Amino acid sequence: MGTITSTFTTLLFLTTLALAESPAGTPRINSISYSGSGCPQTQARFSGSLDNPTLTFNHFAIEYPNTVNRTANCQVHMQAQGVSAGWQVSVKDTFVDGHVTLDPGATLDYFSTVYFSSSADDSATSKGQLTNDGSSRIDKAVTLQNHFTDKAWSSCTTSSNDGFGILNINFRGALRNEKSYFEATSETWDFEWRRC
């Protein structure tokens, strides 16, 4: 019984702490656009809110060997308002769903870079890699996660209905070594808030 009580108390504390580490209410996205070879304006669609954002791709596909389309990127430009004073935001994780085909020896490198336009030199990049080290072809659905240990933080909000400036999130995929194919279908992001 003591163990159950202790566990419940710990979970309650962690839940309270998590709730305390985000602004009151949900900031609203008031502007979003995207650019890049993987998401021309007519080939991508955004849905959801800052709590559950989803970017759906219609044209993000790369192939190797291919001198033109072995790499592609999509950069999102986002603004939001409704943040209470005294907060900063960063991107904690990016998740890209898609399908990959890798012959033995082939590699998919994937990168996520985050920065705010007000401080473009202060960027954060996370890299992942998927390699076929086996003897048979890989052909499967994948979720590519990039976690940011070092984060790019927004400036500190100063009013009750402030925004965090222009947030830029760039995802890039690149294939190399052997015959391979990757198609991204959607991207989501997890945000982290802190007091400032």
Task: State what each model feature region is.
Residues 19-196:
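Mature extracytoplasmic or otherwise solvent-exposed domains
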Residues 1-22:
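Fungal secretory targeting signals
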